[in-house]
Amino acid sequence: MYKRQGVVTSNNISALPFYGLARGFLTGKYRQGVTVDSIRAGSVTDYQTERGWAVVDALVDIARAHHSSPSAIALAWLRANPAVSTPIASARTVEQLHEIVEVVHLSQTEVNILNRASA
C-alpha cells in the first residue's frame, strides 16, 4: 500500500488493500528467528525484511498496550490511513475472526510509530 500512497493521494482516490494483514505476516505469528510450521509460511518471505520485522515489533508493542492483537492493530492502522477505503482481511479460524473484527482506535502517536517503522 505505502509504495502507491503518493499516487493514490495525489489523484484523490482511495485504495482497497487486498492483503490487509500481509498474508498473515502482520498477525504477530511470525517473529524474527522463529520458525512457523504452516503451509502458508512461504507466502510471507517477501515481508521478512528489517522493515517488516520493525513493523511487526511495533504492532506487538501497541497491541500489548491496547490489550489487543497485532491483527486488530494492523487493521486499525490501515483504517487510520485516509487513502484506504477499507482493509480486507480473512480468517481461517474462529479465533482469527475475533481478532479481525475487533475495533481499536489508535492515537496519532501510535499511527506515527507504525508509519516510521514501515518507512
Model-found features: residue ranges?
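Tryptophan-centric aromatic hotspots in well-structured domains and transmembrane helices
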Residues: 18-19, 77, 110-118
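A generic structural signal for secondary-structure junctions
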Residues: 30-31, 102, 119
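Glycine-rich, positively charged active-site loop/lid region within alpha/beta enzyme cores that binds
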Residues: 6-60
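Short, small-residue-biased leader/transition segments that mark boundaries at the very start
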Residues: 1-2
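Conserved short secondary-structure transition element at the edge of the structured enzyme core
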Residues: 20, 39, 48-105
